[in-house]
Amino acid sequence: MKRKALTRCAGALLLTAALALGGCGSAGAGGTVTNETAAEKTKQYVYQEEEVCFSDINLSNVYNIQYANGSLYMNGGRYEDDAAVLFYAVYDTEGNQLSYAELSFENGGETGISENIFAVGSGGDIYAVQTVTTNSGNEEDYSYNAVQRIVRRAMSDGSEIASADIAMDKNSAVGDYVNQILSDGKGNLVLITSQSVLIYDEELNLVKMLKAQNSIDNAVMLRDGSVAIVSWQDKGIAFQKLDLSNGQFSEAIVPENMEGYSFYAGIGYDLMTSSSDGVYGLNLADNSCVQLMNFVDSDLSVSSIYNLSAVSETEFYAQYYSDSDNSSHYSKFTKVKPEDVKTKITLTMGGIYIDSTLLSRVVSFNKESDDYRIKVTDYSVYNTDDDNTAAQTRMNADLIAGNIPDIIVSNADMPIDSYIGKGLFADLYPFMDGDNGIDRSRYLTNIFDAYAVDGKLYQLVTSFGVSTMVGKTSLVGENQGWSYEQFEQFAAGLGAETDVFSQATRGEVLNNFMQLSGGEFLDWNTQSCKFDTDSFKQFLAFLNTLPETINYDNISEQDWSELDAVYRNNRAALLMTYVSTFTDQKYLSQGQFGEPITFIGFPEESGNGSAISPSLVLAISSKSANQDAAWSFVKSFLEADYQDSVYNFPVSLDALEKKAADAMQPPYYYDVDGNKVEYNDTYYVGSVEIPIHPMTQEDVDQVMGLLTSLNQTLRIDSSLMNIVTEEAAAYFAGQKTADETAQIIQSRAKIYVEEQE
């Protein structure tokens, strides 16, 4: 069966940006090289994309795509009523469909048939693993079984040529099934389970059964005819080569800092793999791993690549999911010669665990700018299983040494106050008010001001949530905010039947209070500590009334059901929570508490004890030679397309008003035909279903009142937290008084603050 030829989507020559990090270990910190040398070096990682547009094929329905015998083979499926429809298709590299076949399997009741994995034989036939599953259909005595067989199919029409049941090792664990089938193109088929390797010939005769030395997580047929066995072990990803001729496994190879999860046969390299930042080549003989392609350099908004097939040392086909348009693509990628890549002025951006949304906007900026490109350094590659603080340590060392990216992606673990004190960040207010600025009156200026120091804004929050404490208005009153003294009086005044919190340990409360109102005891601007105050001593005394641990194993199902209703029944008064959308208010008031609530916040002598918990914070280096260009990128996060798209609270008033209006409407979704369908919202308290109604204007006003009153920021300083918890432990154990403990914490904290200068 022939179908019309495929069309090719327009490819784009992609330019330069990020310094290679990740995948197979770090290649060095981005801040330690100049922008000029970085621009030249990253030209090595640029690939041109030429998208293949498959007519009449929805890539979301495709299971596998393989390059074999000069053609592209794929299979996929969809469900129609009680039938599973499987298809196989073949295309040539020019985009013409060579064959297409559909098979229908009746799937219903207790039986299901699937055929998701396949390999291409030496003659072009398909060898698939078919799985037939059955279940007892009895909910009280449920059982499940799966039987697998190899099916040889003619590629022209999908017809079955032959089949054979798969011979499993009798000693294999129950549930050990074939999850991969490979072909060496020379008559050998290799079936992979989690414990065994089964070798068949193309006539479906079992030739050899091998027991793996370790659990098998992945396997790849290499170009030399051997099989790379991949296992995830305690020390990392381990590789072994299996010689099919003699059934011998090589010694295990464990590369350092290997981050790839899917591996494919390479050309010029044993294996190719994709990481969050690009594609890498790996040779097992010398344990070498090098970056081949960088996604950002190549103007690709993608977090991973799969179904990769190498066709030469400089070309490969692969499928990827685009973060920019939320759809799947299949493309041919060809390496661009470094001398053919246009040189632009390079802006550097550094952060830890830079997410796909941010990278997508970097790609958009790089495409749209004629003069600038952003180079991304994600320091998270320095983290290991043994040290998850290595990234923060390395980035901090670079910044302190003066190797500062033009754009900094901030996080709560950074010693931001110290950076500001050293003059590392630029004031953003002049940019906001300049020719390429914004109308500040259309934003939550209190959010900006909360991050300002002495009238200067060094960090820009683009969206946020609120960490706060909530109670019934009937218990805590209507006003937001209270002091430590008021909090202590409230806690002491509760009856014996009402706990302050539900199921909260002293460690949880201490951690939350220090993050959300710890600024009460430490002022980085003045380098002053106030841990020896009566407020802090009273807080220690309150913490001592809370349990150190909670044994959740002793909580019965009935107790769990009652815990759902503790706030409704006044068995607990305060909830430490996180609010990120308008609708969170209705679930709290109508659902969890069952009556009007107040965002009372954490105790804070100087203001509202609810804290801004930012989703994304950006800063610009005061040392940057390209601050205007950096601001152009940062400013894009304040524009409508971004502000309207964020899930949690935007800083734009226009975007907030849209979200508020939506919250006052019934919830809805769009069906498969694109029709808007409204539905009734509910909340469960135990097994009781509670109807949740759309928010009223009064509800929306309450949330807006919370947002416009925020003036505290979430603070996380692990070193300071360690000082407090270490010394407080002696007080909780009865070894020191509150006065002694407060004095020791005050002394240690003061020394710590002074050392940060």
Regions found by a protein language model. Name each.
Residues K375-Y443, D564-V566, R571-L574, Q590-Q592:
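Extracytoplasmic "Venus flytrap"/periplasmic binding protein-like
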Residues A496, V634-Y668:
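Periplasmic-binding protein-like
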Residues D413-T468, E485, P596-P603:
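Hinge/lid segment of periplasmic solute-binding proteins
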